[in-house]
Amino acid sequence: MVGSRTSPIFNALRVELNAREAELVEIPLIQPADPFLDMAGEDLRRRIFLTENENGDSLCLRPEFTIPVCRNHIALNAATPKRYAYLGEVFRQRRDGAAEFLQAGIEDLGAADEAASDARSLADALSCVKAIAPDAPLEIVLGDQSVFAGMLKALGLPQGWRKKLLRSFGDAHSMDLALAELTGTQRRDPLPESLAVLVAEGDEIGLARMLEAEMLEAGISPGAGRTPVEIARRLIEKEDLAATHFPAAALDLLRQFLAIRVSLDMAAVTLRAFAADNALDLGAVLQKFEARADAIAQAGIEMKDIIYDASFGRPLDYYTGLVYEIRDASNRQDGVLAGGGRYDRLLTMLGACEAIPGVGFSIWLDRLQALAGEKQ
């Protein structure tokens, strides 16, 4: 395993987390797989170590902490606001490097002041990184999925296309493919006739049954990766979306928006000018954006040191607003030290009886250890 529970970095981070009014929780290593498969995003789904218990239930080694920390909060029926800290192993299949490594972080649940809790999350993550590597050159990149969602709405895109593009947010390759589909320039491979009939009829149940049968016949577990129901839903959705094309001028505006990359102190004025020049109604989302930027400044973080990238997202499906990464500025290829964001719908999706907003971050201890120059 990269990193160690006995290393000075591990202990120093424990001290940092304890100083931030967060309850340190222990989360089991073995987790039910379905919440991760349903909500964690395509990139993480491919990396999960899956297994089954004797009852056939899908289980996995813990691939991240946010989902199980939120499930634990719901199971305890705990009051909010509540802050949880964690420090422990996660397991992901990697082409290179160790599959088991340490993460630390804080999940802030139920805070009423969204702007202040967003700013606190970023400030906490930055403080933890600087406590371990005080002299390291850092780059902070911030995005906002809610601003992107507001842009899609202002352009008048149908709901189905909004959902598809939101799923692609932050993944440049996926976004390029989605935009090519929207213009009708991306040709789709034809489906087998037996599947095509069910897709054309919108028969999600029948299609899922056929897909499950084909997966079993091919020796593929229906619980490995996307479920047959999810695949069926996506195929039907693709058929519906294929019939929709969007004006080239509107798509050009969307590409211009995604190209915006400025320091945070210039972001709000840049976005307002873009909206005004193109008659786009982004007032509500930009008001929240500005409130957060003000809160970040009040938290003592220099806004000129933060990059706002309109196309920046993180490869986890549960984010809804703020997303950010703290990176090693000297390592552009694999330099993400910490990442986080807001996930206001996640707890409801996990079974909470009422809406509970959340924001949190994770730190990669192996990368932070390498940056700090600590000997393993």
From Swiss-Prot:
It holds the Pfam family tRNA-synt_His. Keywords: Amino-acid biosynthesis, Cytoplasm, Histidine biosynthesis. GO terms for biological process: histidyl-tRNA aminoacylation; L-histidine biosynthetic process. Transmembrane segments: none annotated. Gene3D superfamilies: Bira Bifunctional Protein, Domain 2 (3.30.930.10). It is found in: Cytoplasm. The keyword Glycoprotein does not apply. InterPro entries: aa-tRNA-synth_II/BPL/LPL, HisRS-like_core, HisRS/HisZ, HisZ. One of its GO terms (molecular function) is histidine-tRNA ligase activity. One of its GO terms (cellular component) is cytoplasm. The keyword Cell membrane does not apply. Its main location: cytoplasm. Pathway: Amino-acid biosynthesis; L-histidine biosynthesis; L-histidine from 5-phospho-alpha-D-ribose 1-diphosphate: step 1/9. It comes from the Bacteria. Belongs to the class-II aminoacyl-tRNA synthetase family. HisZ subfamily. HAMAP family: HisZ. Required for the first step of histidine biosynthesis. May allow the feedback regulation of ATP phosphoribosyltransferase activity by histidine. NCBIfam families: PRK12295.1-1 (NF008948), PRK12295.1-4 (NF008951). Heteromultimer composed of HisG and HisZ subunits. This function is generally fulfilled by the C-terminal part of HisG, which is missing in some bacteria such as this one. This is ATP phosphoribosyltransferase regulatory subunit.
